[in-house]
Swiss-Prot record:
Organism taxonomic ancestry: Bacteria, Pseudomonadati, Pseudomonadota, Alphaproteobacteria, Rickettsiales
Gene Ontology molecular function terms on file: DNA binding; DNA-directed RNA polymerase activity; magnesium ion binding; zinc ion binding
Family: Belongs to the RNA polymerase beta' chain family.
EC number: 2.7.7.6
Entry keywords, A to Z: DNA-directed RNA polymerase, Magnesium, Metal-binding, Nucleotidyltransferase, Transcription, Transferase, Zinc
GO CC list: DNA-directed RNA polymerase complex
Gene this chain is encoded by: rpoC
Keyword Ribonucleoprotein: no
Catalysed reactions listed for this entry: RNA(n) + a ribonucleoside 5'-triphosphate = RNA(n+1) + diphosphate
Superkingdom as given in the UniProt entry: Bacteria
Record: residues binding Mg(2+): 461, 463, 465
Name under which the protein is recorded: DNA-directed RNA polymerase subunit beta'
Residues annotated to bind Zn(2+) 1: 69, 71, 84, 87
Stated role: DNA-dependent RNA polymerase catalyzes the transcription of DNA into RNA using the four ribonucleoside triphosphates as substrates.
InterPro entries, alphabetized: DNA-dir_RpoC_beta_prime, DNA-dir_RpoC_beta_prime_bact, RNA_pol_asu, RNA_pol_N, RNA_pol_Rpb1_1, RNA_pol_Rpb1_3, RNA_pol_Rpb1_3_sf, RNA_pol_Rpb1_4
């Protein structure tokens, strides 16, 4: 401990290792108490002194004033410890009034409401009685038989009062024992033999076959075992003594008008004392039983109200109603409760807040701090300096001097703030970049000045935003602020590793303007050899910034023979503006003039900043960014780019496009009238046509607007949008093209578009149509912000204890990563996915067999390039999901820390970073919904497949038939078209839907833009495989099929309806059968009969008895109308995935490989599908599909394990059960990333993997072996592995288990730390569970340590924790400990400690760590 004393580390918070919780026994309550309270008096109404013996009694709770007894006989510190003989008060510090407890001795026992009513009722479970019965005993005066003695009554039988009286008359007064109220329950609990119950339940569990009964037994068994293991006694759940909180925690505060404001708890205690005293007096008087019962019930209700008012049975006095008094439970739970209000979030002193304004003259590490604020915030520092320099003798005079703002004060303030970083924070703090450190620069005025480049990290703008300032006081805090939190040390975003300190808005515009080049060729191109000559020519206006010039550029390369650098020069054609920009670039071989010699938009500028950071390091990047900013601002103002009405050029072709679209829509209406297409098909075609028309107009507008004009040069609005400074193509489309289609709040698209644009102005009808989107945007913003904030909170809670605990867990497991292909195009390359990960196995070039990356080596940019050249399409890398580290993860499985670009440091809280990275964009995006103003963002449905490159076609699972026109029709439901390059590597894969027309053969070579296949995107067809005659089976008019007349067209369609609603429809199986000329059913190539089952809502395309050809469509299933998908649709999807909810219309997944067979229907509602395995020895697996749901497999189809059998999203739990963890991870990552990708947000996969790891912490036992686990029990993975290894050591059989997926809320509540779970949600439930189980909290996570007031075990605190643990061990234990769990201390000491890497300007980190 001496070692810790150096750091002042032996405070109460540090002096314990874990927290235990259990039920308090009456003895322990009395032991904690300093005296019994029998009186309800509080203070004397005249003297306002506290009354002796009352709820604030100084004799019991301690003196009201420091070192002063109540009567005033003893006053002063010297009498400390003396007990006044007159008033009986101990002379001590008044602080004890926050610690000393009292108690009430109850005349009659009462049940503790938490154990009674918190479901499942613990008292009910132990006694095996329903809650209703127990309540009737406690509140309604029913009796329970304790001991039947010689009567036919049974033990535990509940009888009413009249039955009790009757039994007494029949059997005699003493022939049996029956009691009522809490005494009865207590007596039953005392008589319980838990060990016997445990043995009985276990034997019952083995013999039972009913699943429901098994679940019930398991529930009860768990509660019984928890009681046995924890050492709690069941009768402690019935209270005979009630503790009273120390008085300073329930104070009496006098208001301005002199009336006292009483804490609600005092009201509860008074009621209890009153009723208890009254009951005591009553019992002495021997009154009628009904009076006693009533008084006992009132006492029970008073105690219930004290512990938890919300669980009371009667409705009045519920939370929120007038006169509601807060109970102890209310003080713990919710946002205003003790945990979240006072323990996890506290108000901070030495802080201030003010409006922010832009500070374009600041350096990146600086912020402008108003002098007035600085003076107040740094007051103690100034006082001490004034005293130290002898300017003032006392602190009081120093304060006066500061108040008068004497000149000396300002000089000292300058000295005090020199190199003293301050923290700036902008709410909402959605990720760690919401708080950053800066060096303050004193400024006049009252607003804080902020550097423009950090705005994107803070998500700040200057329209009235406010920011808070905090001062790190201690030297350690200042050191951490400078090294870890300084804005210059946070250049990269922790969520995707791309720079976040990048120019935006005006800066981009200035740089874009600077790199533009005149389109008009000058009469003669001037030639320059030196930049000073260019500046001279610019000054004399001989040339313009954008003029074309020739310049002699000097280059330097490394010579091939290694003799040193070679210099050469080259003439380049460029502009003065680009040369100006080139001057600020740092020198490095990776930074060539070609980077600048082009028109730079936001994309290129971001890439340049990234390249500068990767090539030249941090300090160069910071300098470069600052120079880039000032250059950008300067030329944005010089360029004179403005926003003019005439810049919005409406294309001449607009009317033509609109007319064409209108004509087509009339055509669709005619087709619909003639019954060629259905209503939904017409709607979908109309929507598509208008989308196409809007896109064409937008394209023409962009063409017109981007034309270089002799007079006005380039169009200003085009420059703003094209550079990426402000606005987007979709906003410009609305300004000068046409507004397009609008969405209703429900998400449906209104089929009449807004043809006008904002320049022309909208008519009344169009304006009214626009209001939908605008209002939806505002309502969404309010609702979704709350939703997204709650998602972030749950994510942080589930991942908070995921910390990097060691360097390498030595695992060889990992996942194969592939590039992400969506709709045939590569949306995420393999390079991006594997960058910054660690290889799980050696990676070789498949052709040359050269070793590219060793197993366990970080894949950096250079290695990614090697892998890309080698043409690998999959790489196995380590993942947080497969990490084998205990109580956290290892650095190598995590890979690169995206914020510093190097392997993650030990002690990094990667869980919280992951949660912030996933949660932060959710909030951002929801806030961004209304910017487009509700116009429908939706592409045209893809209906064909075009080759994107010259390639060779490979068809996978292609079962095709030829129709009467000679077209090849795809009959397989899992047909893929793969395009291979000349080497045979897969370049593109696209699934082709059932019913598509295929234009290529297997092995055929295709040219770029050649059509491969097409299909109808609006309907799902059912197609015949052979030629024959159609016969209706079970398609009965009015029962399973209806003629639906379309009123607008007068045409009727035959639609299949829900036949289950009819009595005679019970056993129908509506289908179309294909027969030959003799009427025999045709056999298909699979060997099965040609039966085509028809789902509800399908439209029949053939008549009974009609002849059909192979490849004909016999039924069409219309797809539902298309809805727009933005993050408002996307955020609930992300929540659904993280909560691991079963999708509403979830698909059924095949558990095995095999052939599909349709069985006999199950009652009215379900269809039976069998999957017959390939191996005949195995029995088929049965699935029940709701009738009328469209199955996407046909009889005889071969399905693989994990294939879907019907429409819908698969259930993640099914994927885990059938295909395992890797398939689940791939599915979840793909689905979550798809939502974010739609919004253009990049999140690294590893963040999602970290959250998934936390969701997969539990396993389900299906065979307990010789362990004490129960079947179906959910246990922690680490705990099972530990138990199993112990079992194997003693030669017993271990438990068998399967991994289970928990939603983030469930996982947070099931965590090993009850302190963390209680502070998250369902506080009373968690604490009840923890108390009767006698849980221990070892304080491993971050939250638990914040709550008990310690340094968190992450970052710098991680090392302090290790030192603390090592300092508590003796020499022998130390070496064992060091060798086993802490072999990584050496690697920590070598510089892996607190996220500091040498590139961050700290030359030697070992000195910072080697204590």
């Amino acid at each position: 401990m001496k070692m810790l004393d150096l750091y002042g580390y032996t405070s109460i918070a540090q002096s314990f290792d874990k927290i235990c919780i259990s039920i308090a026994s009456p003895e322990s309550i009395r032991a904690m108490s300093y005296g019994e309270i029998k009186d309800i008096s509080t203070t004397n109404y005249r003297t306002f002194k506290v009354e002796k013996g009352g709820l604030f009694c100084p004799k019991i709770f301690g003196p009201v004033n420091d070192d002063e007894c109540l009567c005033g006989k003893y006053r002063k510190k010297r009498y400390r410890g003396v007990i006044c003989e007159k008033c009986g008060v101990e002379v001590t510090s008044s602080k004890v009034r926050r610690e000393r407890m009292g108690h009430i001795e109850l005349v009659s026992p009462v049940a503790h409401v938490w154990f009674l009513k918190s479901l499942p009722s613990r008292i009910g479970a132990l006694l095996d009685m329903p809650l209703k019965l127990i309540e009737s005993i406690l509140y309604s005066g029913d009796f329970v038989v304790i001991d039947p003695i010689a009567t036919p009554l049974s033990k535990g039988e509940v009888i009413s009062e009249s039955a009790y009286n009757q039994a007494k008359d029949n059997y005699g007064e003493d022939s049996f024992i029956a009691l009522t109220g809490a005494e009865a329950i207590r007596e039953l609990l005392v008589r319980l033999d838990l060990h016997a119950i445990n043995a009985n339940l276990r034997s019952e569990l083995e013999s039972t076959t009913s699943e429901m009964k098994r679940k019930k037994i398991v529930k009860r068994l768990r509660i019984v075992e928890n009681f046995i293991n924890s050492g709690n006694k069941p009768e402690w759940m019935i209270l005979t003594v009630i503790p009273i909180l120390p008085p300073d925690l329930r104070p009496l505060v006098s208001l301005e008008n002199g009336r006292p404001a009483v804490s609600d708890l005092n009201h509860h205690y008074r009621t209890i004392i009153n009723r208890n005293n009254r009951l005591g007096k009553l019992l002495k008087l021997n009154p009628p039983a009904i009076m006693i019962r009533n008084e006992k019930r009132m006492l029970q209700e008073a105690v219930d109200a004290l512990f938890d008012s919300t669980r009371r049975s009667y409705v009045s006095n519920k939370a929120g109603s007038v006169g509601y008094k807060k109970s102890l439970s209310d003080m713990l739970k919710g946002k205003q409760g003790r945990f979240r209000q006072n323990l996890l979030g506290k108000r901070v002193d030495y802080s201030g807040r003010s409006v922010i304004v832009v500070g374009p003259n600041l350096k990146l590490h600086q912020c402008g701090l108003p002098k007035k604020m600085a003076l107040e915030l740094f007051k103690p520092f100034i006082c001490s300096k004034l005293k130290m320099y002898g300017i003032v003798p006392t602190v009081k005079l120093a304060n006066k001097m500061i108040q008068n703002e004497k000149p000396e004060v300002w000089d000292i303030l300058d000295e005090v703030i020199h190199e003293h970083p301050i923290l700036l924070n902008r709410a909402p703090t959605l990720h760690r970049l919401g708080i950053q450190a800066f060096d303050p620069v004193l400024i006049e005025g009252k607003a804080i000045q902020l550097h423009p480049l950090v705005c994107s990290a803070f998500n700040a703008d200057f329209d009235g935003d406010q920011m808070a300032v905090h001062i790190p006081l201690s030297l350690e805090a200042q050191l951490e602020a400078r090294i870890l939190m300084m804005s210059t040390n946070n250049i990269l975003s922790p969520s995707n590793g791309k720079p976040i300190i990048v120019p935006s808005k005006d800066i981009i515009l200035g740089i874009y303007y600077l790199t533009l080049q005149d389109y008009v060729e000058p009469e003669e191109i001037l030639f320059f050899g030196d930049f000073s000559h260019v500046e001279y020519a610019l000054h004399n206006k001989d040339i313009h910034i954008c003029s074309k010039i020739k310049y002699k550029m000097n280059y330097c390369t490394d010579s091939s023979d290694g003799s040193g650098p070679t210099y050469y020069s080259k003439i380049v054609e460029t502009t003065p503006g680009r040369l100006m920009l080139w001057q600020i670039f740092p020198e490095h071989k990776n930074l060539t003039f070609d980077l600048v010699n082009q028109v730079l938009t936001v994309k290129e500028i971001t890439a340049i900043v990234d390249l500068v950071y990767r090539s030249c390091g941090q300090s160069e990047t910071v300098e470069f960014s600052d120079k880039l900013m000032s250059l950008g601002f300067r030329y944005a103002s010089q360029s004179g780019i403005s926003f003019g009405r005439m810049d919005m050029i409406i294309p001449d072709t607009k009317t033509m496009h609109v007319d064409n679209a209108s004509e087509k829509i009339k055509e669709f209406a005619v087709q619909y009238q003639d019954g060629l297409i259905t209503k939904s098909e017409r709607y979908n075609k109309v929507i598509d046509e208008w989308s196409k028309c809007t896109d064409l107009i937008a394209k023409d507008m962009m063409k017109a607007i981007s034309v270089y004009d002799e007079e006005s040069k380039l169009n200003s609005i085009y420059m703003m949008a094209h550079s990426g400074a402000r606005g987007s193509a979709s906003q410009m489309k609305q300004l000068a093209g046409m507004r397009g289609l609008m969405a209703k709040p429900s998400g449906e698209i209104i089929e009449t578009p807004i043809i006008s644009n904002f320049r022309e102005g909208l008519n009344v009808f169009e304006y009214f149509n626009s209001t939908h989107g605008a209002r939806k945007g505002l309502a969404d913003t309010a609702l979704k912000t709350a939703n997204s904030g709650y998602l972030t909170r749950r994510l942080v809670d589930v991942a908070q204890d995921c910390i990097v605990v060691e360097y390498d867990c030595k695992t060889h497991n990992g996942f194969a990563m592939r590039s992400v292909i969506d709709g045939g195009t590569v949306v995420e390359t393999l390079d991006n996915i594997i960058l910054g990960r660690v290889a799980a196995v050696d990676i070789y070039n498949p052709i040359t067999e050269e070793l590219l990356v060793n197993a366990g080596e970080l894949i950096d940019e250079a290695k990614v390039e090697k892998i890309r050249i080698a043409g690998l399409d999959a790489v196995k890398v380590r993942s947080p999901l497969t990490c084998e580290a205990k109580k956290g993860i290892c650095a190598l499985c995590y890979g690169r820390d995206l914020a510093i670009g190097d392997v993650v440091s030990i002690g990094e809280a990667v869980g919280v970073i992951a949660a912030q990275s996933v949660g932060e964009p959710g909030t951002q995006l929801t806030m961004r919904t209304f910017h487009v103003g509700g116009t429908a963002m939706r592409g045209v449905e893809t209906s064909n497949l075009i080759a994107m490159l010259d390639a060779k076609v490979k068809l996978v699972n292609s079962n095709v038939v030829e129709d009467k026109y000679g077209n090849k029709i795809v009959m397989s439901r899992s047909c893929d078209v793969v395009l291979l390059d000349s080497v045979g590597n897969e370049k593109m894969r696209h699934s082709v839907p059932y019913g598509a027309r295929l234009y290529v053969n297997d092995g055929q070579l295709v040219k770029i833009t050649e059509k491969i296949a097409d299909w109808d995107p609006y309907t799902m067809p059912i197609i015949t495989e052979k030629t024959g005659i159609i016969k209706y089976m079970d398609l009965i008019d009015g029962v399973s099929i209806n003629e639906v007349l379309d009123e607008s067209t007068g045409i009727s369609n035959r639609v299949v309806v829900d036949w289950k609603l009819h009595l005679q429809g019970a056993n129908l199986r509506p289908r179309l059968v294909l027969v030959n000329d003799n009427g025999d059913i045709i056999t298909l190539s699979s060997g099965l009969e040609a039966n085509y089952f028809i789902p509800i809502g399908a439209v029949l395309s053939v008549q009974d008895g009609q002849k059909v050809h192979a490849g004909d469509v016999i039924t069409r299933i219309p797809r539902e109308s298309i809805k727009t998908r933005d993050i408002t649709g996307g955020l609930p999807r992300v929540i659904e995935l993280f909560e691991a909810r079963r999708p509403k219309e979830h698909a059924i997944v095949s558990d095995i490989d095999g052939y599909v067979e349709f069985g006999k229907d199950y009652y009215r509602s379900k269809r039976r599908i069998f999957i017959k395995p390939v191996d005949d020895k195995l029995s088929p697996v049965e699935y029940l599909v709701p009738k009328g749901k469209h199955t996407i497999v046909n009889e005889g189809d071969f399905v693989h394990k994990g294939d879907l059998l019907m429409d819908g999203d698969p259930d993640p739990h099914d994927i885990l059960r059938v295909l395992g963890v890797e398939a689940l991870a791939n599915y979840m990552i793909a689905e979550i990333q798809q939502v974010y990708r739609l919004q253009g947000v990049r999140i690294d996969n590893k963040h999602i993997e970290v959250i998934l790891r936390q969701m997969l912490q539990k396993v389900e036992i299906f065979e307990p072996g010789d362990t004490m686990y129960l079947i179906g029990e959910n246990v922690d993975v680490e705990e099972v592995l530990k138990t199993n290894s112990n079992m194997e050591k003693i030669g017993k059989s271990p438990a068998k288990y399967i991994p289970i997926l928990q939603g983030i809320t469930r996982a947070s509540l099931d965590t090993n730390s009850f302190v963390s779970a209680a502070s998250f949600q369902e506080t009373t439930k968690v604490l009840t569970e923890a108390a009767f189980s006698g849980k221990e909290d070892s304080l491993y996570g971050l939250k638990e340590n914040v709550i008990v007031g310690r340094l968190i075990p992450a970052g710098t605190g991680f090392l302090m924790n290790k030192i603390k643990k090592l300092s508590l061990l003796n020499k022998d234990d130390y070496s064992m400990y060091y060798n086993s769990e802490y072999q990584d201390l050496a690697s920590i000491e070598a510089g892996h400690a607190c996220s500091v890497s040498p590139s961050q300007g700290v030359s030697d980190t070992s000195g910072a760590v080697d204590y």
